[in-house]
């Protein structure tokens, strides 16, 4: 699990590259600040929060917490484990230089890549890792 996630993340985020780690939750940031503090990896970060209030949202406002970080393979294994164990809300890591995003979740990862060519390149490289579902799900 960790090797694949680190391989994919290193390809999308680079190595020792500045990234932005984003966590999305429903509710206000102060409702979640204490729960983030329990994670060792979160203590290394300095989160800023944005709250998006939708008047029709039944789940309350959407809180996005973001922090700059340096991505290096293996350095964030505890974050990947917490995501795989479904201990976190939605997480996305953004490389501002490339514009690409690595969004791990408990069953894999979504990638938001800079071009269709890049999608084809990585789809070919990691074809053995992809789902056999016709839509790639």
Features from the language model and the residues they span:
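Extended, low-hydrophobicity segments enriched in charged/polar residues
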Residues: 1-85
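Generic surface-pattern signal
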Residues: 7-14, 85-88, 124-131, 135
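Amphipathic protein-protein interaction modules
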Residues: 68-110
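Alpha-helical oligomerization segments
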Residues: 93-137
